[in-house]
Curated annotation (Swiss-Prot):
This is Endoribonuclease YbeY. It comes from Actinobacillus succinogenes (strain ATCC 55618 / DSM 22257 / CCUG 43843 / 130Z). It comes from the Bacteria. SUPFAM superfamilies: Metalloproteases ('zincins'), catalytic domain. Zn(2+) binds at H115, H119, H125. Binds 1 zinc ion. Single strand-specific metallo-endoribonuclease involved in late-stage 70S ribosome quality control and in maturation of the 3' terminus of the 16S rRNA. Belongs to the endoribonuclease YbeY family. Its cofactor is Zn(2+).
Length: 156
């Protein structure tokens, strides 16, 4: 039986109200990697817009903060480490998107963790067929976690 994911939770956001608990982050990440039968270590860093903006500009060339950035750990094949990678989640963007999309805040936090973990596992949504596969898997995982389909909400 899987023990779960080991989470290194770093909260550097000034406002730390309404954040999920460490146990919730672990539950959501574990659900996302369960299909791969992994028990990895993942760093989840909760940041403010300035750090998200800087990282998004540096690594993606996008001049704005974003909800979640995924940085897969690239380990040489001969080295076996359980590190999967890092997720950087922007508190303000997640809160704003949840409100704009009419989603419960915990559901959107869970979705961002699941979405980011799938990126760490190599899933992407650049091409249409990739997006369909990834979104289908996200919906399945979110449903297993007791949340609604994250793509069923309309923007307000």
């Amino acid at each position: 039986m899987m023990k779960g994911v080991i989470i290194d939770l770093q909260i550097v956001s000034e406002d730390q109200t309404n954040l999920p608990t460490p146990e919730q982050f672990t539950q959501w990440a574990t659900a996302a990697v369960r299909a791969e039968a992994l028990e990895p270590e993942i760093t989840i860093r909760i940041v403010d817009e300035a750090e998200s903006h800087d990282l998004n500009l540096t690594y993606r060339g996008k001049d704005r903060p974003t909800n979640v950035l995924s940085f897969p750990f690239e380990c040489p094949e001969e080295v076996e480490l359980p590190l999967l990678g890092d997720l950087v989640i922007c508190r303000q963007v997640v809160e704003r998107e949840a409100e704009q999309q009419g989603k419960p805040l915990p559901a959107h936090w869970a979705h961002m963790v699941v979405h980011g973990c799938l990126h760490l596992l190599g899933y992407d949504h650049i091409e249409d067929d990739e997006a369909v596969e990834m979104e289908s898997l996200e919906t399945q995982i979110m449903t297993e976690l007791g949340f609604e389909d994250p793509y069923s909400y309309d923007e307000i």
